[in-house]
Amino acid sequence: MMHLTFIIPRFQYSTIPFLLTFILAVGCDQLPGKPTPKERWRPATEVTDFSQLYALNCAGCHGADGRLGAARPLNDPLYLALVSAATLRAMIAQGVPRTSAPALAQQVGGPLTDKQIDLLVEGMRSRWGKAESFNNVAFPPYSLQDAGAKGSGPGDSQRGAVVYQTYCAQCHGKDGNGGPKGGSVINPAYLALVSDQALRTAVIVGRSDLGMPDWRANIPGRSMSPQEISDVVTWLASHRQAASIAFKSK
């Protein structure tokens, strides 16, 4: 009877270090659960991804996708066409007076580098802006200072009351305390959180995420004039002052 004999080579223990080195060199970057380069921790000042920067610094107030937040939507092509890149950058870097928008630049104690602020501005305008759609739109002056430089007079509260009844009362109520489509625009708590410029911006571009029309659409075929915008903003702001005086007198 014939027997088959298998010859098994003796394992050389000296090969173990070589095998371990080979496995670590070849398979280390493919281990299950290992984070990708994008997922790895990095210092906050080295984050250069727009989505991460926006989520960490802006989404809490302006909404996860730039809309439906407590503050003005930034995902609004009309707003981004009205506001220059330099103005937007200044607001991010220096904050906005009389609002809860903080200064984010490192030079004033914020967390963001100049490069990160530039990335936020560029990201908003490239992702959410449609400047070419507004090439033929004659925008009102963005600020009261711009309005003065272009020939408009200062706002007048008495004229503003008439402007309010014409363009705004149908949504916000005859006295400004709220109506069928919009909330109060003279509530002291609201006015304490917004600047005059924020009021002006809201009048000009509306709130696209909440259905508030811009300066062209309150009355079909009749846009608000730059003077009317300044007047109604002055009327709105006068309620902030009146509320402050009433509070101090108590």
Set out the residue ranges of the language-model regions.
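Gly/Gly-Pro-rich "capping" loops immediately C-terminal to redox-active cysteine motifs
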Residues: R40-V47, S51, G63, R67-A93, ...
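Disulfide-stabilized extracellular ectodomain repeats and their linkers
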Residues: A55-C58, A71, R98, Q165, ...
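Flexible coil segments in periplasmic/lumen-exposed cytochrome c-class electron-transfer proteins
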Residues: P32-R40, A44, T48, Q52-A55, ...
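C-terminal motif of bacterial Sec signal peptides marking the signal peptidase cleavage site
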Residues: A25-G27
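Sequence contexts marking disulfide-bonded cysteines in secreted/extracellular proteins
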Residues: D29, A59-H62, H172
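Sec-dependent signal peptide recognition
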Residues: Q12-L19
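N-terminal secretory signal peptides that target proteins for export/translocation
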Residues: M1-F11
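Long, charged N-terminal interaction/targeting segments
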Residues: N57, A71-P73, P77-L119
